[in-house]
Amino acid sequence: MLLIDDNAIQAATRQTILRRSGYFAIAALNPRRALEQFQNDDFPAEIRAVITDHIMPEMSGSEFVRELRKTHPHLPVMVISGLEEAEAEYAGLNVAFRLKPLPPESLLSHLRGLLAEDEEGAA
């Protein structure tokens, strides 16, 4: 999993939650750098899904997803935001939009659902 959040504490917390649940998780604080890593295939393992924040400096979550979709149109993406109205920015981008706060059990449940949908779509 790739976690993108400019808030280091949020990123580290979600990374810990995922790792304790058996997922390989990488945290990135900069969405532009994460895109570069995707383009250069610089991740140490296959990224099965992306979890991103919506509001970040330099590049918003919706800008990140638009760019990501150019090269990874089917990669499961979950967007987490405290702004309900932000969901409209993701129309047509095939993402799961979730509102903060998102408790650990909800994060994991939504992620399992995303991965299951992806596996069904690949079958």
Map each language-model feature to its residues.
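Conserved acidic carboxylate
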Residues: D5
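C-terminal output helix
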Residues: Q15, L102-L115, E119-G121
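Two-component/phosphorelay signaling modules centered on CheY-like receiver
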Residues: A8-A27, V95
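Acidic, metal-coordinating helix/loop segments flanking the phosphotransfer/catalytic sites
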Residues: A27-A49
